[in-house]
From Swiss-Prot:
Adaptor protein complex 4 (AP-4) is a heterotetramer composed of two large adaptins (epsilon-type subunit and beta-type subunit), a medium adaptin (mu-type subunit) and a small adaptin (sigma-type subunit). Interacts with EHD2. Belongs to the adaptor complexes small subunit family. The keyword Transcription regulation does not apply. This is AP-4 complex subunit sigma. It is found in: Golgi apparatus, trans-Golgi network; Membrane, Coated pit. GO terms for biological process: protein transport. Keywords: Coated pit, Golgi apparatus, Membrane, Protein transport, Transport. It comes from Arabidopsis thaliana (Mouse-ear cress). GO terms for cellular component: AP-4 adaptor complex; clathrin-coated pit; trans-Golgi network. Subunit of novel type of clathrin- or non-clathrin-associated protein coat involved in targeting proteins from the trans-Golgi network (TGN) to the endosomal-lysosomal system.
Length: 143
């Protein structure tokens, strides 16, 4: 397994979306998220987007007011994960039109659905924006 978890966090450190691909208790998740968020938010724009934490490599990127953080195994390619984050943001932009924190908050199920289309059991399985968004567009038409 490559990807262990994906977090979307605002500038104040509030988690807006969390998707885990390994089992952790709620207490372990809260502690892990708190540690990672503090570590990443304390860094400045000139520092590298890769951080080691516990037994994870954290790859993160800031888009507007949201930080996208992905925890991966040591042997995962950091640049590929940065590209994955960019693809996720582009996909959300295409659906929501310049995605922002409120889009995630009010359409959390769609954000999770996009992630579920892209990542299965910690492995990236879909990179086509059209294929990722197709089921969501069908659901939107049905409502």
């Amino acid at each position: 397994m490559g990807i262990r978890f994906i977090l979307m966090v605002n500038k104040q450190g509030q988690t807006r979306l969390a998707q885990y691909y390994e089992w952790l208790t709620l207490e372990e998740r809260r502690a892990l998220e708190g540690e990672i968020v503090r570590k990443c938010l304390a860094r400045n724009d000139q520092q590298c987007s890769f951080v080691e934490h516990r037994n994870y490599k954290i790859v993160y990127r800031r888009y507007a007011s949201l930080f996208f953080m992905v925890g991966v195994d040591d042997d995962e390619n950091e640049l590929a994960i940065l590209e994955f984050i960019h693809l996720l943001v582009e996909t959300m932009d295409k659906h929501f039109g310049n995605v922002c924190e409120l889009d995630i908050m009010f359409h959390l199920e769609k954000a999770h659905f996009m992630l579920e289309e892209m990542v299965m059991n910690g492995c990236i399985v879909e990179t086509s924006k059209a294929n990722i968004l197709s089921p969501i567009q069908l659901m939107d038409k049905a409502h």
